[in-house]
C-alpha cells in the first residue's frame, strides 16, 4: 500500500515538472487576426517574456502576465514610434520613454496608455517641456523652452497656457502675470532689456486697460492704454519734472489736457495729435497769461495776453507772434488799436496816449510811417506824411494858437516850401528850415503890406521888393517893428 502511494506521488511530481518545463519553453503561436506571439506561456496564456507582432507593424517585446502585457517592455508602433518602459493591461503605465518617428521624445509617467503625470518632452523642433501632463497635453505646472530663447514657466490647462506664469522672450524681455488661452490677460508686468517697464492690465496679449508705463529715460505714464498705446485718460511725469495730465488718443496727447513745465510754464486746454491745438490758456514763467486759440503748439488765431505789469493785447496771432488786427493797452495808459506785424504796429492803426495825444494812420515796423493824422494834447492837429515816426514830406498842421502851416516837413520840422498862416492874419509863403523862415519867401501882413526877400533864422535879411497899401503914412520905424512882429509870431512847430 505504501509502495503504491509512493509511486503515485512520484508520478505526480514528474508530471508537474514536465508541465513546468513546457511553460518555460518558447512557443510561437499565430492568432486569427494575424498576430504572432513568440514566447512563454502558462496555463495556455502568454506569461513571462515574449514578443507579439501584428500585421499592421505593431510589435511588443517584454513581460506578460497571464495573457496580459504587463511589466517592462518595448513597443514599436506602426507610425515608427518606440516606447520603452512599464506596461499594465496592455498599455504603457508608470514610468516610460517614447521616441517618436520625427525624433521627438517623452520620458516620464503614463496612465492608462496616455502621457499623464510628470515628465520631460523634447519635440522635433527643439522645444523642450518639463512638467505636468494630462492625456498627452501640458496640464498643470510646467516649463517650456524654445530654441529661440523663449521660455514659459507657469501653469497650463489642456495644452494651453493658462493661469500665473513667467515668460522670458528671445530679446530678454520678461513678463510676469496672468495668462489666458495662451495670451497675456489680466494683471501683469513686462520688463524690457532697455529698461522699459509696464505694470497693469492686458487683453489678447496686448497692453490694454489701466497701467503704469515707465520709459527707459525715466518718463512715467499712469492711465489708460489700448493695444500697447496710451489711449484715454492718463498722466505723464517726465524725467525733467514736466507733467501732463489729460486725454490721449493713439499714444499722443489729444482732447483736453493740462501741461505743467518744471520751469513754471502751464497750459490748460485742447490738444490734437500731440500738439496744442484749439482753445486754451497758457501761463508763462514770467506771469504772463494768454487765453485763446492755438495751432501747432503756438498761439494762432484770436487770443488775449495779459502781462505782469497789467499790459494787455487782444487780437490776431500767427505762429506765436502778434500779427494781424488787435488792440494793445499798455501799463502807462497808452492804447493802440489796429494792424500788427511781428508784434509791432504795422498798417493802419490808432495810438492814443494818456496825455491826450492821438495818432491815426499808417504804421511800419512799430513807427508812424506813411499818411496819418496826429492830434496833440493842446488841440493842435497835423495831417500828412510821416517817416520813421517823424513828420516828413507833405503835411499840414493847425495849432490851437491859430497858427497853420501847409507844406513840406523834414525830421519833424517845417523844412522846405510851405505856407504859414499866423494867428494875427499874416501869411508867409516860401522856404523853411528847422521850423523857421529860411531862404526865399514872401510875407503878406494883415495890414496889406507884402515883403519878398531872403530870410535867415526867421527874420528878413535881404529885402527884394515891398508893396505898401494905400494907407496913412506909417510911423517912423514901423517897418522894423513889423519884422519883429513877424519873428515873434512864428510858432515852434514840434511833435
Model-assigned labels for residue ranges:
Residues 27, 433-472:
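Leucine-rich solenoid repeat scaffolds
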Residues 36-47, 59-70, 82-93, 105-115, ...:
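Conserved anchor residues at repeat-unit boundaries in beta-strand-based tandem repeats, strongest
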Residues 9-17:
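Bacterial N-terminal signal peptides
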Residues 1-8:
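Bacterial N-terminal signal peptides that target proteins for export
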Residues 51, 74, 97, 120, ...:
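Extracellular beta-strand solenoid repeats
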Residues 21-59:
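N-terminal segments that cap or nucleate solenoid repeat domains
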Amino acid at each position: 500500500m505504501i509502495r503504491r502511494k509512493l509511486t503515485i506521488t512520484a508520478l505526480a511530481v514528474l508530471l508537474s515538472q514536465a508541465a513546468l518545463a513546457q511553460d518555460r519553453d518558447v512557443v510561437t503561436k499565430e492568432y486569427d487576426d494575424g498576430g504572432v506571439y513568440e514566447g512563454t506561456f502558462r496555463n495556455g496564456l502568454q506569461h513571462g517574456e515574449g514578443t507579439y507582432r501584428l500585421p499592421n507593424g505593431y510589435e511588443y517585446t517584454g513581460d506578460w502576465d497571464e495573457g496580459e502585457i504587463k511589466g517592462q517592455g518595448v513597443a514599436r508602433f506602426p507610425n515608427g514610434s518606440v516606447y520603452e518602459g512599464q506596461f499594465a493591461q496592455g498599455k504603457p503605465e508608470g514610468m516610460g520613454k517614447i521616441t517618436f518617428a520625427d525624433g521627438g521624445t517623452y520620458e516620464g509617467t503614463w496612465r492608462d496608455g496616455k502621457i499623464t503625470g510628470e515628465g520631460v518632452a523634447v519635440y522635433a523642433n527643439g522645444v523642450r517641456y518639463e512638467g505636468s501632463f494630462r492625456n498627452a497635453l501640458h496640464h498643470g505646472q510646467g516649463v517650456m523652452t524654445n530654441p529661440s530663447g523663449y521660455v514659459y514657466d507657469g501653469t497650463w490647462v489642456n495644452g494651453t497656457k493658462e493661469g500665473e506664469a513667467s515668460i522670458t522672450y528671445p530679446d530678454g524681455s520678461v513678463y510676469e502675470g496672468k495668462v489666458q488661452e495662451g495670451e497675456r490677460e489680466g494683471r501683469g508686468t513686462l520688463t524690457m532689456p532697455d529698461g522699459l517697464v509696464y505694470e497693469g492690465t492686458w487683453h489678447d496679449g496686448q497692453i490694454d486697460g489701466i497701467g503704469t508705463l515707465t520709459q527707459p529715460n525715466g518718463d512715467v505714464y499712469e492711465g489708460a492704454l489700448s493695444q500697447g498705446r496710451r489711449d484715454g485718460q492718463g498722466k505723464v511725469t517726465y524725467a525733467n519734472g514736466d507733467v501732463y495730465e489729460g486725454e490721449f488718443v493713439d499714444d499722443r496727447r489729444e482732447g483736453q489736457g493740462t501741461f505743467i513745465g518744471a520751469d513754471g510754464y502751464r497750459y490748460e486746454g485742447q490738444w490734437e495729435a500731440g500738439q496744442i491745438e484749439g482753445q486754451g490758456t497758457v501761463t508763462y514763467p514770467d506771469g504772463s497769461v494768454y487765453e485763446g486759440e492755438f495751432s501747432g503748439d503756438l498761439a494762432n488765431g484770436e487770443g488775449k495776453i495779459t502781462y505782469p505789469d497789467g499790459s494787455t493785447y487782444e487780437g490776431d496771432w500767427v505762429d506765436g507772434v502778434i500779427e494781424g488786427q488787435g488792440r494793445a493797452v499798455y501799463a502807462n495808459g497808452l492804447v493802440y488799436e489796429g494792424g500788427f506785424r511781428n508784434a509791432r504796429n504795422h498798417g493802419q492803426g490808432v495810438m492814443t496816449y494818456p496825455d491826450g495825444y492821438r495818432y491815426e494812420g499808417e504804421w511800419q515796423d512799430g513807427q508812424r510811417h506813411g499818411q496819418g493824422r496826429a492830434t496833440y494834447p493842446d488841440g493842435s492837429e497835423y495831417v500828412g506824411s510821416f517817416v520813421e515816426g517823424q513828420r516828413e514830406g507833405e503835411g499840414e498842421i493847425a495849432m490851437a494858437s491859430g497858427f497853420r502851416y501847409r507844406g513840406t516837413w523834414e525830421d519833424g520840422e517845417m523844412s522846405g516850401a510851405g505856407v504859414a498862416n499866423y494867428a494875427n492874419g499874416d501869411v508867409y509863403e516860401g522856404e523853411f528850415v528847422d521850423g523857421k523862415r529860411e531862404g526865399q519867401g514872401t510875407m503878406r501882413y494883415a495890414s496889406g503890406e507884402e515883403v519878398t526877400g531872403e530870410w535867415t533864422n526867421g527874420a528878413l535879411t535881404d529885402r527884394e521888393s515891398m508893396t505898401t497899401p494905400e494907407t496913412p503914412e506909417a510911423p517912423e520905424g514901423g517897418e522894423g517893428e513889423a519884422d519883429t512882429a513877424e519873428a515873434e509870431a512864428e510858432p515852434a512847430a514840434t511833435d
